[in-house]
Structure formats: C-alpha cells, structure tokens
C-alpha cells in the first residue's frame, strides 16, 4: 500500500510531505491555537515542531495538504502503522489544519480522500485521538468514526501523559457513511 499517494479532490491536493515544505508548514503550525486542545499543545514552538516534522519525514506516510485555489500548504496528515494481517488496517492521524480552514469542509474532504485510498487496501482505518481533545473527537464523529473500546495508549507530552481513544471507520461504514451521503 502506498502511504504517500497524490490525492486530488474538488478543493484539495494531498501529496507527499517534503523537506522543502518546512517554511510553509511551520507557518501554519506556529499558531498556538491550532494546538490548543491537542495533547501536545506546545507543538507550535519551533524546536518542538522541528522534531515533529523530522519524525514525519523519517516515518513516511506524511502528506502535505494544499488548497488548490491558493496553492498554499494549509496543513498535514499521515498514514501510519499499516498492518496487512486480518484484512488489513492502517492509522490516519497527526492531522492539523490552518484555522482559516476549520469548519468549512476541509477536514471532511481530506479524510474522504485518504479513506477512499486506504480502504482499497485495508478493511479498517483507525484514528487515535487525545481523550480530552473534544474538537478532534467531534470531527471524528462528524465523518462517521465509531468510538471503539480499544485502548489508544498513553503518549508522553510536555505537560505529562495523555491518554488516547481509538475511533475506526471500516470499509462498509465508509461506503454508506456520512462522507458518501453529504
């Protein structure tokens, strides 16, 4: 499975994240409000984001999200933890968007593109979300994510441990879910 495809929608282009994207992506990430509810709420700080960016490049699977109208990078997301066993699964996450693109359908289109690609190869897509990140949890529910009873683990952040929950979207849920119907 290609974890760094080029995906194009009506308003968005998703393409592999490259080292040359640093300045444009950090311009988005340097807004503290982007990370306000995120467990790693200090990610707007340059040294913290540099480590995050380097990890994204090293791990592979990271995508730059581009507004087709302006040509600007407006965020990023990743496909990680591909497991072909048992029908296959992959995790989509590490997503953030410029505040100018909150609430207007950008996340919906981005996730629809990523899910349509991933679900050609796997039966299930998982999303680990910070337990207290209510903005991301609401966004998951809007796109048809189902909260599972699987433990999302604890991630160590600058402010201490942060518990995560796991949402999932299966191939069948996606085919008949809100991303297909409106």
What name fits each language-model region?
Residues 1-104, 117-119, 124-125, 131-134, ...:
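GNAT-family acyltransferases
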């Amino acid at each position: 499975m290609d974890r760094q495809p080029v995906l194009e929608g009506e308003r968005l282009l998703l393409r592999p994240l490259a080292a040359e994207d640093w300045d444009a992506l950090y311009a988005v990430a340097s807004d503290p409000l982007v990370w306000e509810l995120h467990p790693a709420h200090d990610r707007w700080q340059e040294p913290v984001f540099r480590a995050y960016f380097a990890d994204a490049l090293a791990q592979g699977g990271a995508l730059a999200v581009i507004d087709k109208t302006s040509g600007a990078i407006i965020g990023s997301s990743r496909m990680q933890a591909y497991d072909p066993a048992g029908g296959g699964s992959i995790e989509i996450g590490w997503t953030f968007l410029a505040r100018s693109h909150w609430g207007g359908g950008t996340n919906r289109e981005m996730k629809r593109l990523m899910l349509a690609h991933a679900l050609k190869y796997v039966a299930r897509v998982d999303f680990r979300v910070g337990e207290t990140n209510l903005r991301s949890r609401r966004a998951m529910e809007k796109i048809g994510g189902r909260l599972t009873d699987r433990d999302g683990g604890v991630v160590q952040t600058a402010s201490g441990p942060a518990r995560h929950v796991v949402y999932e979207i299966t191939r069948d849920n996606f085919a008949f879910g809100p991303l297909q119907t409106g």
